Amino acid sequence: MSDKTPRKPTAFRLEQPARVSAASEQEEPRRPRAVKDLEQITPQADVFDLTDDEAAELEILDPAFEAPERKGWSLSRILFGALGILVSFAIGIWTEDLIRALFVRADWLGWTALGVAMVALAAFAAIILRELVALRRLASVQHLRKDAADAAERDDMAAARKAVDALRTIAAGIPETAKGRQLLDSLTDDIIDGRDLIRLAETEILRPLDREARTLVLNASKRVSIVTAISPRALVDIGYVIFESARLIRRLSQLYGGRPGTLGFIKLARRVIAHLAVTGTIAMGDSVIQQLVGHGLASRLSAKLGEGVVNGLMTARMGIAAMDVVRPFPFNAEKRPGIGDFIGDLARLNSDRNARK
């Protein structure tokens, strides 16, 4: 027990803190003022900015399309043209000899062969006419691209209206563009700057087609990536990439109203492949791919699945190049799709397959 006397109860008065009104707590907003001493401003680096090397690498990986201008006749055109004439002469002489020989055997055989030859000639002429119309349609799309870019650059209202009318003619048979064409019809009598009219037509008519085109490119890239990941032979990979790329080019051309024939498709495929260096640029773009995916593909995917991503990117680049070629207007108001729009989906698809294994 302690000898100390317990302390008596004592009352204490607590000092109430001064209440600060909510209005006084709010700081008065700073009045806007001009900064005259620029040395006081300290710029900060953006963590999402690419370095110069990475930006150059990404530019090489995903180049914009520039239509090549060909003037005159090349040696290859002269060669194949001459060979085509010789083959035509050979077929004509062979057909004539065959018909004469059949007339010698029996008149009805000769007349039958002559009738069949006339039917074949008429069908051949119809095919040639259809191919020429398709080639002319592709050429008109290329000229329209140049006219639209020139009208937007010069802000020429008359040239812009002419280009927009041509675009409406091309898109007349596409149901997805009906709403945009109706809107442009309502603005026929309005006064709009040439550049704004081009951008408006691109937004209202081509935006739905661009969304569908992105879906086509992404789905084709996914199919190529999956087939590459499960195929046992590299020859199967190459064959399927070629098949899927050819089908993608044709479907994109039909989507934008191109409807190419056989010769038109060959010319279109040549123009698409002309500005692609897929294998080399894909190999150079690993550091950019690492930044976009989040970490290195080699540490995330197996070798076979990594090949699937690369082949999918090859198909995506082919699709982007095809969009550049077959699109009636160049990308101005709308953002041009890039490799970065497809890398994440392809890597996620293949990593999910790797996780299930």
UniProtKB/Swiss-Prot annotation:
Belongs to the UPF0283 family. The keyword Cell inner membrane applies. HAMAP family: UPF0283. It comes from the Bacteria. This is UPF0283 membrane protein BOV_0999. Its main location: membrane. It is found in: Cell inner membrane. It comes from Brucella ovis (strain ATCC 25840 / 63/290 / NCTC 10512). NCBIfam families: hyp_HI0043. PANTHER family: UPF0283 MEMBRANE PROTEIN YCJF.
